[in-house]
């Protein structure tokens, strides 16, 4: 077998291995709960009643009326509705299989882009790194936006590279990039940052094209048209929200509440004065306004006047333990948010912020982002949130630690690859490199503003990281233009 045949064999083996890994997650760790059911209900009601909203019981016995909502963008419910139409309503197993295919497409796109930038060897290594990445594969087994968002990110950067190679004019790759950016924006509101990173880089690429004698306006016309097309899908959504609710809402409200719903901010502010770990998100943040909250689940720093509690001190002796315990007791009487309870949380928050503003505005946001980046990504597995504490079985603790080490390895490969790419002078793709770096930086800046730490919010870095890692395995020969060219390079 020649080198070309071996390349195709190894690439095929990577995709098969990636398929088996994702099917294993679907078979053993599929999870349909929480936000998955929220999206599912929106899709079902949209499909069956034509109303994008949630069902509510009326005073009539057993009667359900669907009321419109705007708390979620329609991109993922649209995907679910299409799957429900094809495979049956609430057939989530079929949805997961479609997501498996989408995730494998993400692997291929990252590999193909790495091949164009760094050659065939890099393409093959990136394909294996992507196919065997358990963190992205795990999310293919749960009906959430993450898998499709990763695909749109990979497609946007791949389309950008192809568009630039084709002369940065009006061509099919311009429309591919537009579609990827637009649908990514319909999936999650913060994906507007992807367009913010990519569109200026496209302007840069259009203006920097060698030999172009057109004026600035004509040279950049494709980019302005692309920017308009990215925003077009938001027009009917914005018009619908104005017509239905009387509010201007082109995306989705950060509070995840409809107009007229009470918005309680005191608890969230208090939570931001001490929270770092995903365990706090799961055990406290998600329980507010609906479930009991246990004060024993709070770390000692939640009762201190500062970022950290003194070592060796029992929580009950800290200055804010008594008022916090009394507030928890009152809340747990009803397990529902109310203005008096929320005001007391706000008072606690203000007291803590006055005592240590640097902690609230800088130290804790950075700590939360670091936790999202480097925590073991086992949140979808039957492993305790506090995996490092007893009584977690030692085998589970060891597995979580190994997962954290693997995650760190992906980060190190990515940033080492970025430095290697820079040493190569970006190989003619400086605008693309700038867009990728901007997408990562903007996302990390956004995460600094969030209340709750969730590792899934940093999954969106992986399509970029995989391509960057490919620079460490760059071929010394010229870049191939196509995947067929990559294989042909191997036979040369």
PLM feature segments, named:
Residues 6-33, 229-240, 442:
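Transmembrane signal-anchor helices characteristic of membrane glycosylation enzymes that use polyprenol
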Residues 8, 90-94, 334-335, 343-347, ...:
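Membrane-interface anchor segments at the N-terminal boundary of transmembrane helices
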Residues 34-39, 94-102, 125-160, 171, ...:
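Multi-pass, polyprenyl lipid-linked donor-dependent membrane glycosyltransferases
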Residues 42-47, 60-89, 100-101, 460:
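Short hydrophobic/aromatic helix or loop-helix immediately within or flanking a transmembrane segment
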Residues 74-81, 86-105, 127, 139, ...:
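Loop-to-helix entry region of an early transmembrane alpha helix in multi-pass inner-membrane enzymes
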Residues 94-118, 155, 415-419:
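Transmembrane-helix motifs of polytopic, lipid-linked glycan transferases
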Residues 117, 156-174, 204-208, 473-476:
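Membrane-interface transmembrane helices that cradle and orient dolichyl/undecaprenyl
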Residues 250-378:
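Membrane-proximal stem/loop segments at transmembrane-domain junctions that anchor or position
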């Amino acid at each position: 077998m020649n080198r070309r045949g071996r390349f195709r064999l190894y690439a095929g083996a990577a995709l098969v291995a990636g398929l088996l890994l994702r099917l294993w997650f679907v078979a053993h760790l599929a999870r349909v709960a929480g936000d998955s059911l929220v999206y599912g209900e929106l899709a079902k009601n949209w499909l069956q009643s034509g109303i994008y909203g949630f069902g509510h019981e009326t005073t009539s016995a057993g009667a359900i009326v669907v009321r419109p909502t705007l708390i979620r963008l329609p991109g993922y419910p649209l995907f679910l509705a299409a799957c429900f139409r094809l495979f049956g309503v609430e057939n989530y197993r079929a949805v997961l299989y479609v997501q498996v295919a989408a995730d494998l497409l993400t692997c291929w796109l990252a590999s193909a882009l790495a091949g164009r930038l760094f050659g065939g060897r890099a393409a093959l290594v990136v394909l294996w790194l992507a196919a065997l990445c358990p963190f992205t594969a795990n999310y293919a087994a749960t009906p959430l936006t993450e898998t499709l968002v990763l695909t749109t990110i990979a497609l946007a950067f791949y389309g950008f590279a192809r568009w630039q190679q084709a002369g940065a004019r009006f061509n099919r790759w311009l429309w591919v990039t537009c579609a990827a950016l637009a649908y990514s924006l319909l999936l999650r509101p913060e994906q507007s940052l992807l367009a913010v990173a990519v569109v200026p880089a496209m302007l840069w690429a259009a203006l920097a094209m060698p030999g172009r004698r057109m004026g600035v306006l004509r040279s950049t016309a494709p980019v302005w048209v692309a920017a308009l097309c990215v925003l077009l899908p938001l027009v009917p959504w914005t018009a619908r929200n104005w017509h239905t609710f009387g509010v201007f809402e082109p995306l989705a409200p950060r509070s995840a509440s409809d107009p007229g719903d009470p918005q309680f901010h005191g608890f969230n502010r208090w939570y931001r004065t001490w929270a770092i770990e995903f365990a706090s998100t799961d055990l406290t943040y998600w329980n507010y306004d609906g479930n009991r909250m246990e004060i024993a689940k709070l770390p000692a720093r939640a009762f201190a006047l500062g970022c950290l509690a003194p070592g060796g001190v029992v929580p009950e002796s800290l200055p804010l333990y008594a008022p916090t315990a009394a507030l928890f007791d009152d809340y747990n009487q009803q397990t529902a948010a109310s203005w008096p309870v929320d005001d007391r949380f706000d008072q606690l928050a203000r007291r803590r912020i006055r005592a240590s503003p640097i902690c609230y505005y800088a130290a804790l946001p950075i700590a939360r982002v670091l936790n999202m980046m480097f925590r073991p990504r086992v949140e979808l597995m039957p492993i305790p949130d506090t995996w490092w504490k007893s009584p977690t079985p030692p085998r589970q603790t060891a597995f979580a630690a190994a997962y954290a080490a693997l995650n760190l390895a992906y980060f190190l490969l990515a940033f080492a690859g970025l430095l290697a790419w820079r040493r190569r002078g970006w190989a003619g793709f400086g605008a693309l490199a700038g867009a990728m770096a901007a997408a990562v930086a903007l996302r990390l800046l956004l995460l600094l503003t969030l209340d709750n730490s969730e590792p899934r919010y940093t999954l969106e870095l992986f399509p970029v990281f995989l391509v960057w890692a490919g620079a460490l395995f760059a071929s010394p020969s010229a870049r191939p233009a196509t995947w067929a060219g990559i294989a042909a390079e191997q036979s040369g």
